[in-house]
Structures are given as structure tokens and as C-alpha cells.
């Protein structure tokens, strides 16, 4: 059995409610099991970006399309165009009824360069969601 260490994490009440719903819906035995699973997936998805090798992948970002965010994303596109193979964009309405922009990048190149690009995306103000998938 794996040696497990206990830590403490604080969440807003609304997020705990959502976590509890996922635990019940997906059949997890506890919040801890769900959170361990989520952290494990995060580490696995991001770990290939720490190696210095050629990889391919997809980066998804959903954000509030403010002037500042649109300008920042445009700047990032030009700064990192050597790893961007294609880009698909759409304006959508979120489940909360807010307007958002979705950008899906297909990327290929040195994992360190892709990591730098993704780290900049993570800093976008008004970001609703982001994800990187490396294969």
C-alpha cells in the first residue's frame, strides 16, 4: 500500500458542493479520492512539458473576451507561432449566460517552447478554463 500523507485544503463552499456532486455522480468513495485523481491527471498532463523533446498536443483556453485579453492572446499567438500548427476560435455563451471566447490550438515542437506558451495562457486575466493535452 502507498504511504499517504494528510494535508489540508480550503475551498469555497460553492466548489465543495460541486465536488460533492461529482463524488456522488462518478462513484468516488470520498472527496480525497476525487482530489487525488484530479491532481494525478494534472501532473500526468503537465509532466511531458518538463522534458526537452519534440511533442504534439492541444491547448484549449476559454476566456472573457475583453479588449485586454484579446490583445494578450493575439500577442501570444505571434510570439509562439513556431509551435502553433493551427488555431480554431469561436464565441460562445457559457452555462452562466456570459459571453466567452474559445481558442483551440494544435501545437507541435519542443516541449519547453510549448510549456512557455501554455504558462503565458494560464496568466490571462478573465480566463475561465484552460487545458493542455500532450501526446
Swiss-Prot record:
One biological process term in Gene Ontology: regulation of DNA-templated transcription
Pfam family, one: NikR_C
Cross-referenced CDD domains: RHH_NikR_HicB-like (cd22231)
Keywords: DNA-binding, Transcription, Transcription regulation
Domain of life where this protein originates: Archaea
Annotated GO MF terms: DNA binding
Stored InterPro entries: Acetolactate_synth/TF_NikR_C, ACT-like_dom_sf, Arc_rbn_hlx_hlx, CopG, CopG/NikR_regulator, Ribbon_hlx_hlx, TF_NikR_Ni-bd_C
Family, similarity comment: Belongs to the transcriptional regulatory CopG/NikR family.
Name by which UniProt lists this protein: Uncharacterized transcriptional regulator MJ0767
Amino acid at each position: 500500500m502507498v504511504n499517504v500523507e494528510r494535508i489540508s485544503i480550503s475551498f469555497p463552499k460553492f466548489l465543495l458542493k460541486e465536488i460533492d456532486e461529482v463524488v456522488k455522480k462518478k462513484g468516488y468513495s470520498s472527496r480525497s479520492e476525487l482530489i487525488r485523481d484530479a491532481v494525478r491527471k494534472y501532473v500526468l498532463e503537465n509532466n511531458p512539458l518538463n522534458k526537452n523533446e519534440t511533442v504534439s498536443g492541444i491547448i484549449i483556453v476559454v476566456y472573457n473576451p475583453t479588449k485586454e485579453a484579446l490583445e494578450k492572446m493575439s500577442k501570444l499567438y505571434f510570439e509562439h507561432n513556431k509551435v502553433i500548427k493551427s488555431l480554431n476560435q469561436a464565441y460562445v455563451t457559457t452555462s452562466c449566460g456570459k459571453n466567452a471566447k474559445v481558442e483551440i490550438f494544435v501545437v507541435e515542437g519542443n516541449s519547453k517552447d510549448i510549456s512557455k506558451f501554455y504558462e503565458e495562457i494560464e496568466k490571462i486575466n478573465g480566463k475561465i478554463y484552460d487545458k493542455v493535452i500532450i501526446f
